[in-house]
Amino acid sequence: MAQTPEFEEEIYCSFCGKSSNEVKKIVAGPNDVFICNECVALAQNIINEELTVDQAAQVLSLPTPHQIVAELNDYVIGQEDAKKTLAVAVYNHYKRINENVSPTTDVELQKSNIALIGPTGSGKTYLAQSLARILNVPFAIADATTLTEAGYVGEDVENIILKLLQSANFDIEAAQHGIIYIDEIDKIAKKSENVSITRDVSGEGVQQALLKLLEGTNASVPPQGGRKHPQQELIQVDTTNILFIVGGAFAGIDTIIKERLGERVIGFGSDANDNAVALDSENILEHVQPEDMTKFGLIPEFIGRLPIVTVLDELKVDDLTKILTEPKNALIKQYTALLGLDDVELVFQPEALEAMAELAIKRHTGARGLRSIIESVMKDIMFDIPSRDDVEKVIITKASVQNGIAPELHLKKVG
């Protein structure tokens, strides 16, 4: 018969020091370590608090649409309607993500990707880039013309996600909240509305390949890119919360819009009424509808993934002049600062600025063409000034821009 001990050795919690008589339960661990139920509960509370903090950290600090536009105004000139539309769309997108992290409603909030329509150099890429900078999220740019559907020579659509991963330093969680801008999206339009028997590898096929990414899927991304490393382990990226912004000039869609509205020919000798004149104005693209984009060559399913469409205006001379001088990172400010490092004052005459703007319009390059123009004007000055210590001021004139005449140099006074 087993002998019952007269007393059991008292056990103490290794963490709080309480005895087994003071708590409900003490659990034994290896190496004579014990923990009581109270310390277990306390540890669980600490863990829960840390998880709550980690979850809160995933909630993006989100500026209001007014704040977003105010910050965009520091860098982007004009395009007021587009800025407002983008600010609201981006705010709602990230508000939706924050809601998914800490749900307060059982309503399913769906993603709204964005399409930007506007001429070359109107600021489509720069707007998307500026939004990502304001929100401090990873950003990547892709060129739709380089994409092909799987099985053909070219770039797989998954490589777009790879660029975003690279921008996020392969932080998958950060990348999954990033922004991707796909440029030249109009170049992957179908060649005709009728489905061709032959494969359109750079048109409808690419649109089909992009569909899943835009709506949200677990994309298998090759970390080394391309198809050169078939054995590489793939990275899984959920695109559900990635905001896709696509942009294109959509040259010729204005004609499609006019035809839909019954204004086939507006010009000399036409009986156009006041409404027709309005439709022929520069704001014709503001009347764009999904059916126009379908007729242009985008498939309905693809358009359906882009519920927000905004139009950018063609930039005028006044806009381009302001772009040269007003933003925080304006080109004129940059070159003035560069010459200032050599103790030389740089001045652009107003007529010179206007001439550069007119040249950009003449070349149909818009804002993106301004840098090459100013680089050409400044090349010799930037080459010579570091070797001279007698120049006090450089003045860029209209003739410097239009005719390549050397800028005016003001020399330092001797003695």
Swiss-Prot record:
Q: Any one cellular component term from GO for this entry? A: HslUV protease complex
Residues that coordinate or bind Zn(2+): C13, C16, C36, C39
Q: Which gene encodes it?
A: clpX
Give the family per the record: Belongs to the ClpX chaperone family.
The task this protein performs is described as:
ATP-dependent specificity component of the Clp protease. It directs the protease to specific substrates. Can perform chaperone functions in the absence of ClpP.
InterPro entries referenced in this protein's UniProt entry, alphabetically: AAA+_ATPase, ATP-dep_Clp_protease_ClpX, ATPase_AAA_core, Clp_ATPase_C, Clp_protease_ATP-bd_su_ClpX, ClpX_bact, P-loop_NTPase, Znf_CppX_C4
Q: Which residues form the signal peptide?
A: none
RNA-binding as a keyword of this entry, yes or no, is no
Question: Per its record, how is this protein called by name?
Answer: ATP-dependent Clp protease ATP-binding subunit ClpX
Which ranges does the record mark as transmembrane? none
Q: Which residues form the ClpX-type ZB domain?
A: 1-55
Alphabetical UniProt keywords: ATP-binding, Chaperone, Metal-binding, Nucleotide-binding, Zinc
Q: How does it assemble?
A: Component of the ClpX-ClpP complex. Forms a hexameric ring that, in the presence of ATP, binds to fourteen ClpP subunits assembled into a disk-like structure with a central cavity, resembling the structure of eukaryotic proteasomes.
Any Pfam family matching the protein: zf-C4_ClpX
Task: Name the Gene3D superfamilies on file.
Answer: 1.10.8.60, ClpX chaperone, C4-type zinc finger domain, P-loop containing nucleotide triphosphate hydrolases
SMART domains recorded: AAA, ClpB_D2-small, zf-C4_ClpX
Which CDD domains does the protein's record reference? RecA-like_ClpX
User: What Gene Ontology terms describe what this protein does at the molecular function level?
Assistant: ATP binding; ATP hydrolysis activity; ATP-dependent protein folding chaperone; protein dimerization activity; unfolded protein binding; zinc ion binding
Q: Which domain of life is it from?
A: Bacteria
Q: Name one GO biological process term.
A: proteolysis involved in protein catabolic process
Q: What is the lineage of its organism?
A: Bacteria, Bacillati, Bacillota, Bacilli, Lactobacillales
Q: Which residues does the record give as ATP binding sites?
A: P119, T120, G121, S122, G123, K124, T125, Y126
